[in-house]
Amino acid sequence: MEIKKRIEELKNNQTGLTFYSSQELNDLEKIVKLREDLNKYRDSYYNDNKSLISDYEFDILLKELESLEEKYPQYKEISSPTTSVGASLKENKFKKVEHLHPMLSLANSYNIGEIVEFIERIKKKIPKEQELKYCLEVKLDGLSISLTYRQGKLVRAVTRGDGFIGEDVTENILEIASIVKTLPQAIDMEIRGEVVLPLASFEKLNNERLEKGEELFANPRNAASGTLRQLDSKIVKDRGLDAYFYFLVEADKLGLKSHSESIKFLESMGIKTTGIFELLETSKDIEKRINYWEKERESLPYETDGLVIKVDEINLWDEIGYTSKTPRWAIAYKFPAHQVSTVLNDVTWQVGRTGKLTPVAELQEVELSGSKVKRASLHNISEIQRKDIRIGDRVFIEKAAEIIPQVVKAIKEERTGNEKVIEEPTCCPICNHKLEREEGLVDIKCINEECPAKVQGEIEYFVSRDALNIMGLGSKIVEKFIDLGYIKTVVDIFDLKNHREALENIDKMGKKSIENLLNSIEESKNRDYDKILYALGIAEIGKVTSKILAKASKNIDKLMAMTFEDLTSIEGIGEIAANEIIAFFTKEKNQKIIQGLKEKGLKFEIKESEASVQNVNPNFVGKNFLFTGTLKHFTREQIKEEIEKLGGKNLSSVSKNLDYLIVGEKAGSKLKKAQEIPTIKILTEEEFIELKDKFD
């Protein structure tokens, strides 16, 4: 059901609304309002060069929307601000062009605890013996830009746009004095950076506009964006825009092994960088530099809204991975938002679908950013202990990238001695079962497979829109069915038809609603294999990964039989995901659920129409391919599609699992690494075509 239809349905039943359906109505109306507002703010920010709210306030609203969409996954939409970058471009004189490589955004963090978590996630994804270094750079508050050089000549400049399509502003970029038009070497490269208006130029510009009676720019970022989109290039030249660059796309093709090397390379080409670049090794080092730059940023000649932390080693980036919006190997630290202090009265614990316990601070009500606040996030018990936060403390709270505010720190100077240490719970607050914490991890979990909170979360996830999309099983109905004993596992959903008479006696369950629910349950048996995989709720396995697994395994029996090596050889499946998959299928409970779902009629296999293999090439089936350098006969996407069509798999890095490396012009470090592994066959583009045509 579409969200607006559900809202209308609830509104038409105002007299019969329960507390829970009333809450649902409020939440759904909030989702619609948040989407409308966030899209309006993005459109104004990216297309009209006007900030209607601060970045900080935008992040709060976005996080609130993310949380509500997680609560009501059946109403998620592809067009939601939570799943896209930038904004759709308006029609103007600038040509719309596709980025050669998507311009992703960065995940935001607002406290050092999130940086610590970021680093811990990185460590889990790579071998323990791997030494890690992190690059710390200032985050400029300007207009993101991508420059393309061909044979050393600047040929194209494109704005971020929506991350996939931007505006060609080459003519105006050429008017910025600091932009290098011709490189000292005749090379091809793409670089990313930020166009800014220096603070001195911003002040001068606004003074001039004030004298002319013109509207003042709210901030340097809006001024820079508005200037770069001027129809008259002379205005761009006169206003004194500047540009700093921080990223070299596909630096490994130029033989560079680290981000720090790529920055030095850019500087050797005359490309302007901020010059603020630090290599650090630990979260403690990063915390020290964050504290330093929070004070020193005011001395910089341009506006900055935070810092960026990146893994330095380029060859680790693919292994660490990406989300649909952001790289997992980089994170932005946003400088602190407005803080207020209040008293921590108590701590309550919430239990999620996976059994994870989350501590919530119960606060003395206080106003923050125009709203009343009485609850805040405490993240996890490790954060509580690290910050030494106690019940009765006066604490600083701030609104950042959280649905609710977060507790930043305790004001220890105001302690009276009556404060109580927050104890780590030993029993689940819902089912009273014992809790466990895996060695080296921060989360406490309820391990009772029958915990009502976990069961309800699993059911809601299973029936959500992106999974089996079963209409009529909202949170309160699921809770009711669990209480009545009709549902203990997801398999029981398909036996609800046996309780038709009993269902009719449930408050608010009319015959029509029951009929629609049972029909929706029956229809769900025909969902695609990848949807059913996603619905199982395997940790680390989202929508995209489910598609990858479905395509690679063809059916669940083959997937369940896969070894760790089999799984990690699949492009897009890392070590953490592989371990989670194996752990999931090893559990007897999950094996029984899968068998039960099969018996109910769910098809854990790719449909015959999807599994056509008429185009496969015996030379490609089961083989792993990778290409490097510039290809003459294919674009990157074309060659990937060709390989997959013929039965092969695309890898993103050189490893012992690679069978063929296709080498184009100006091949980078991948060629050198492949030459060190005797089992890898190295092909020219022409040899690849010959291999393909043998059975094409």
UniProtKB/Swiss-Prot annotation:
User: Which top-level enzyme class is recorded in the Swiss-Prot or TrEMBL entry?
Assistant: ligase
Q: Which one GO biological process term can you cite for this protein? A: DNA replication
Q: Which reaction is this enzyme known to catalyze? A: NAD(+) + (deoxyribonucleotide)n-3'-hydroxyl + 5'-phospho-(deoxyribonucleotide)m = (deoxyribonucleotide)n+m + AMP + beta-nicotinamide D-nucleotide
Q: Which GO terms describe its molecular function?
A: DNA binding; DNA ligase (NAD+) activity; metal ion binding
**Which residues act catalytically here?**
139 (n6-amp-lysine intermediate)
Q: Which Pfam families match?
A: BRCT (PF00533), DNA_ligase_aden (PF01653), DNA_ligase_OB (PF03120), DNA_ligase_ZBD (PF03119), HHH_2 (PF12826)
Cofactor dependence is on: Mg(2+); Mn(2+)
Q: Which SMART domains match?
A: BRCT, HhH1, LIGANc
Q: What are the GO cellular component annotations?
A: cytosol
CDD domains the UniProt entry points to: BRCT_DNA_ligase_like (cd17748), LIGANc (cd00114)
Q: Which residues form a coiled coil?
A: none
Which PROSITE patterns does this chain map to?
Answer: BRCT, DNA_LIGASE_N1
* EC numbers on record: 6.5.1.2
| Annotated binding of Zn(2+), by residue | 428, 431, 446, 451
Keyword terms: DNA damage, DNA repair, DNA replication, Ligase, Magnesium, Manganese, Metal-binding, NAD, Zinc
Report domain BRCT positions. 615-696
Provide the binding site for NAD(+). 55-59, 105-106, 137, 160, 194, 310, 334
Q: Which family does it belong to?
A: Belongs to the NAD-dependent DNA ligase family. LigA subfamily.
Q: What does this protein do?
A: DNA ligase that catalyzes the formation of phosphodiester linkages between 5'-phosphoryl and 3'-hydroxyl groups in double-stranded DNA using NAD as a coenzyme and as the energy source for the reaction. It is essential for DNA replication and repair of damaged DNA.
Q: What is this protein called?
A: DNA ligase
Organism of provenance: Fusobacterium nucleatum subsp. nucleatum (strain ATCC 25586 / DSM 15643 / BCRC 10681 / CIP 101130 / JCM 8532 / KCTC 2640 / LMG 13131 / VPI 4355)
